[in-house]
């Protein structure tokens, strides 16, 4: 990170990460979870010796006892996350075609509360960019927690508004590195946008000729409204591409929302209706 091999977006998190790595703070690595990498430690039932090993030991190295009990906890999921970029690509087989082609990867997207711990298994930086997003808070700006009872069940939201509405709300309201508030009205607005897009698509499909072939007709067949909407489309596509290249997903989502709703549906489709009739 200090050499610039890995960059953070937003850049201000570079200092946070370096300070965290140099701070040497104590860190509780164990978790009481059903799933995860179980801690590779065994305890001798007779003398209390702790044995750390890659595989289950047969005897205690101190007293020779065969009565060994494994630690029931799992490692913090940060360990799993650190292994993910290469463990999914065939590692530890370093001749894996996927590992050679895809590793190192490009981008890690993570929250600022999940600073990654790069483990030196491969000798290479696992990615060149770390995109930091905020956390989703409740409507009052509080962190969601079991103790406050303010958590949101995404399955209930999806059942009421649809998965696409929840996804779009989370993207549309995001800015790199900043928290956002969960507001149900925004999910409802995203649902309405999805319905608008569905209705626009249905209108187009109902009016397509049976022999329609996708493609742009020659310029002589385009009237002024066609050229206008295509110009707007190219403008928003260019602006969105720039946003996405700079990890500004929220701005990109806002642009597509505005184009579909304000330009395409409210203007172009209404202009096109008399021509189709």
Regions found by a protein language model. Give the residues of each.
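Structured secondary-structure scaffolds
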Residues: 1-209, 229-272, 276
């Amino acid at each position: 990170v200090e050499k610039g091999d890995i960059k953070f977006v937003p850049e201000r998190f570079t200092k946070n990460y370096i300070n965290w790595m140099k701070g040497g703070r104590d860190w509780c690595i164990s978790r009481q979870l059903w799933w995860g990498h179980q801690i590779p430690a065994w305890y001798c039932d007779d003398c209390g010796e702790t044995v750390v090993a890659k595989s289950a030991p047969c005897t205690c190295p101190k007293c020779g006892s065969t009565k060994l009990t494994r630690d029931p906890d799992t490692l913090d999921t940060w360990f799993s996350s650190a292994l993910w970029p290469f463990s999914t690509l065939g590692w530890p087989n370093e001749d894996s075609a996927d590992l050679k082609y895809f590793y190192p990867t490009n981008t890690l997207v993570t929250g600022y509360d999940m600073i990654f711990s790069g483990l030196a298994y491969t000798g290479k930086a696992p990615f060149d960019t770390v995109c930091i997003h905020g956390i989703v808070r409740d409507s009052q700006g509080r962190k969601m927690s079991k103790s406050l009872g303010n958590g949101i069940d995404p399955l209930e939201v999806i059942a009421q508004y649809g998965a696409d509405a929840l996804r779009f709300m989370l993207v549309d309201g995001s800015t790199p590195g900043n928290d956002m508030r969960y507001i149900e009205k925004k999910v409802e607005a995203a649902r309405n946008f999805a319905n608008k897009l569905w209705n626009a698509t249905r209108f187009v499909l109902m009016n397509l000729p049976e022999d329609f072939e996708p493609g742009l007709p020659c310029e002589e067949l385009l009237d002024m409204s066609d050229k206008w909407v295509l110009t707007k489309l190219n403008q928003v596509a260019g602006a969105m591409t720039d946003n996405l290249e700079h990890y500004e997903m929220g701005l990109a989502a806002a642009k597509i929302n505005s184009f579909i709703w304000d330009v395409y549906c409210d203007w172009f489709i209404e202009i096109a209706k008399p021509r189709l009739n």
